[in-house]
């Protein structure tokens, strides 16, 4: 370790709605070259652990095409732009997806979701003192809001029924 691996070429292979896929040519410390795939998530994302006054955690259930099934997750979404503060994103996604808002949102952690080949990050926040409003789902979203006890959520995680990394 210690010697650098250097990218000597980057070729855009696909440009999608929220991500770009590149083929990188990398020079290894031994002088050989290899091609590596790289996925650039253009905007980053935010998620929020929202806890009601009764101690229940707000979760969203939605269909995920990549898994071909519904998942149970904390509310989350991509930033509207690369300059949007992720705290703003978290607050917006909380209200859009759950129909709750909060003025008490604090930063928890920044997650790098797939460090081997992707630069996506998700900043996770904690929200309390929730106020009920209305869901404002995007046209393509079909989200059910559920309130869970933390112990029950932990049980689902240990049983492998919640597999979403940010959750």
What is each stretch, according to the model?
Residues 9-12, 110-114:
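Short, solvent-exposed loop/turn elements at beta->coil junctions and helix N-caps
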Residues 59, 74-107, 125, 137-140, ...:
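The catalytic Nudix box helix
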Residues 23-25, 50, 126-128, 147-149:
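Short, well-ordered beta-strand micro-motif
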Residues 2-5, 32, 70, 107, ...:
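Nudix hydrolase/Nudix homology domain
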Residues 2-4, 39-42, 47-92:
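Conserved Nudix-box catalytic region and its N-terminal flanking loop in Nudix hydrolases
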Residues 25-30, 114-133:
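Active-site-adjacent beta-strand/loop module that shapes the phosphate/pyrophosphate-binding cleft
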């Amino acid at each position: 370790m210690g010697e650098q691996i250097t990218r000597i070429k980057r070729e855009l292979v696909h440009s999608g709605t929220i991500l770009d896929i590149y083929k990188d040519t990398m020079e290894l410390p031994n002088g050989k070259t290899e091609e590596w795939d790289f996925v650039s998530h253009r905007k980053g994302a935010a998620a929020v652990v929202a806890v009601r006054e009764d101690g229940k955690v707000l979760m969203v259930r939605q269909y995920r095409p990549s898994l071909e099934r519904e998942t149970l997750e904390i509310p989350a979404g991509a930033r509207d732009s690369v300059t949007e503060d992720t705290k703003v994103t978290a607050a917006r996604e909380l209200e859009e997806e759950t129909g709750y808002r909060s003025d008490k949102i604090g930063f928890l952690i920044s997650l790098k979701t797939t460090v081997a080949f992707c630069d996506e990050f998700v900043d996770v926040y904690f929200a309390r003192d929730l106020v009920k409003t209305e869901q404002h789902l995007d046209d393509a979203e079909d989200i059910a809001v559920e309130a869970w006890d933390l112990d029950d959520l932990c049980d689902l995680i240990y049983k492998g029924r919640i597999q979403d990394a940010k959750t």
